Amino acid sequence: MMKWFEEVNRTRPAVICSRVRLVRNLEQYAFPSRLDGKLAEEMIGRLEDGLKDLGSADGRHYEQARLQELRDLDRRALRERRVFNSTIASGKAPAGVMVSDDERVGIVLNGTDHIRIQLFASGLHLDELWTQAGLIDDYLNERFDYAFDDKYGYLTSFPTSVGTGLRASVVLH
């Protein structure tokens, strides 16, 4: 299966890739920076159980792993492919990761937020990525209660993500 970063973009050569990221937190748990190890393990287990059938909902196959169980080489490879950042890669707190076979979808559990959904595509495809991110978000929202405030929106670890929890970006040549 071809990975997103192996595709050749001939339609808009200046746009290397697109990314859409959604962050969410669960209502009943403290933010990851305030969550003790035992509760973090419990939450990750609940999220992994809730996500185990995600592939049947979006047609992808996912690999699931705990970051602490990955070899250093695998962590570095996932970091280089921007599945997670260096803070999460080097962190000691319990964390989980799910990656689709084509590596277009990466989901980090208990990183800087409880859930970080990230989608990539070669070229300019923000609308398509947003649609796919929304489907995954809906899937999760049917199974878990998000930390949400009527005035502020989705509550996140960083003030810049409060509200929609959405960040969309493109890498240009």
Regions found by a protein language model. Give the residues of each.
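Long, Pro/Ser/Thr-rich low-complexity/intrinsically disordered regulatory tracts in eukaryotic proteins
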Residues: M1-K151, L166
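Conserved phosphate/anionic-ligand binding catalytic regions in large, soluble enzymes, centered on
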Residues: G153-V170
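Structural signature of FAD isoalloxazine-binding scaffolds in flavoprotein oxidoreductases
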Residues: H173
